[in-house]
Amino acid sequence: MKSILTFILATFLLFPLQAQEKVYTVDNLPKVHLQNKMQYVCNPAGILSQAACDSIDSMLYALEQQTGIETVVAVVPSIGEEDCFDFCHQLLNKWGVGKKGKNNGLVILLVTDQRCIQFYTGYGLEGVLPDAICKSCLLYTSDAADE
């Protein structure tokens, strides 16, 4: 799980950013997983390349098949003045990420104008993926990008 999160974060840092400046809200951000059960990355502004999205989608599909953990990634240029943590929490609830009754969803949010990467786990994942591990993944990836 940690290696998958590290790969996703590294992808965010290594692929060129091609953002259009649009402010996204929880209401206007498309939930791509509803349209295609094998698509986990919401990248409406095209910030990540299609190859990066395909790679992340493939990894997250395998993760869900092996563990039942549903993970979605949202990559947007801006959420306005909204707080990343609150936005991520709202996405988890609005999109219904995770299995009902298990609350085992994970939302990973990248907001380029705020230089923010945020994890939000459902209650059912807090034992498997506590905040300390999420923070460790962020720090590890940030350190690798600085080198």
Task: For every predicted segment, state its role.
Residues 1-24:
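Bacterial Sec-dependent N-terminal signal peptides
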